[in-house]
Curated annotation (Swiss-Prot):
Sequence positions that bind NADPH: S17, W18, R38, K108, A142, R257, E279
InterPro entries in the record: 6-PGluconate_DH-like_C_sf (IPR008927), 6PGD_dom2 (IPR013328), G3P_DH_NAD-dep (IPR006168), G3P_DH_NAD-dep_C (IPR006109), G3P_DH_NAD-dep_N (IPR011128), NAD(P)-bd_dom_sf (IPR036291)
Active site, per annotation: K193 (proton acceptor)
Residues reported to bind sn-glycerol 3-phosphate: K108, G138, K193, D246, S256, R257, N258
Example GO biological process: glycerol-3-phosphate biosynthetic process
Protein name: Glycerol-3-phosphate dehydrogenase [NAD(P)+]
Pathway as given in its UniProt record: Membrane lipid metabolism; glycerophospholipid metabolism
Chief site of localization: cytoplasm
Keyword Electron transport: no
EC numbers on record: 1.1.1.94
Amino acid sequence: MKEGGLRNKVAVIGSGSWGTAIANLLCKAGNETILWGRDENVIDEINNARVNSKYLPGVELFLRATCDLDYAVADASHVYIALPSFALSKVLPKLSLDKFSIVISLIKCLEPDTGRRMSEVISEALDLGHNRLAVISGPNLALEVANDEPSVSVVASANIATANIVAGTLKCPGFYCIPSSDIKGVEICAASKNLVALISGIARGMDLGDNTRAALITLGFRELLRLVLENGGTEETVFGVAGLGDVVATCNSHLSRNNKAGVLLAKGAPLDEVKQTAEGVVAISGVLALAERSGVYMPIAQALSQVISGKRTAHSLLDICFSLA
């Protein structure tokens, strides 16, 4: 634990792998941290056994947990949202925040069908100004962060002062934060990289070689770049840890759920099983909605959507990709 006493009361909403990992990190950084979740068994295990065996097995936890949402956010100066996107509409209206609380999104997707960024969804639901919103993204596989593997993340807010404040709460050995004002670019990278990872996983599931996978990742990354730049993001973000860095980690790690989902798609697994594996499968509609709204041509993403819906085979997806090379 960090010496020098507690610095902030921090709440993390969502007791899955990433929510638990970031809550434990915040606790190590010297913050008074409380984790909220719906599953009473998970919460009881965290409080009594100091582990979350369902989502983050083998990691010792130093935090408190609760199923009481009001208790979790009471007097919290920072509130981290680590929920699946589909759960936001149920949970956000129940949040009663301090008027100065900063809300930080850990969600790496766009709203399905609308393409809105998660910070936009949260801002509207909670009536928050830009100076009270931030996002965190980067190559941050939850288990590696929880095991204190050195990691770098981007903390982005339209207000750079807010990004710096949030980065300060996360400061601890082995976890490095880069403040950024490019919140649009960071969020779009986070969502779009899921598609690149799915394509990489499909190639892996088809037992294709590294040459093929590298080409597919590059072509998918090219679409990500166009989408980010057309929507006001920067090249610095795309080629930094929130863009390229996250793509590298997600496409190559056995811990990546989107990578695993791509493997399942290639092997013809039922769609329900694929959806349960990774939110990126569901959220592809958000990326395509944003692309349509901003006039960005994304043929690979469109073909991937057809593979997911069963209208196209994985082999035909490869044909489309290589026709664009």
